[in-house]
């Protein structure tokens, strides 16, 4: 991701971004991960004409205002345009310049496969969340599952999908930071299981370098 020096004159409030939720540097975590029409337009312009891989935006993760424009980190579902290709989650960084130009700054490594079953009501399948905003149920399960967890600090930012089993599995995108001085935040997908009795634990975690 390219970095730019901040100018006090160009810093302005960004829609759907909480000023107090600073990630690292000048990135600010989105207070609501739902994609706004404005962000969708930037995404569509930036990816217009791109061939070889199909990208579908899922959630707004963060944004920052720089001297060159407003930058966005967006979670996407990506599929290589070849028969049998599997859908993956990736984080892309886009920029809307002050003159309106939209461009791709970075496409991250795959986080993991989506494993989504797009047949509505499929039993035992991962079903995409209606909204990327964390639900009360997902938040409660995540909090119970991470009690006493040490080594890495996980902050949930978006609910990706759920799976009904003997209980419920939640697939959650998190900001992950290893607990040591100077560690940088990266994104990780955390799978949490909550039993019918209300007990919860982490099933698996995949960081940005694991597909």
Please place each PLM-identified region on the residue numbering.
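N- and C-terminal low-complexity/disordered segments
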Residues: 1-211
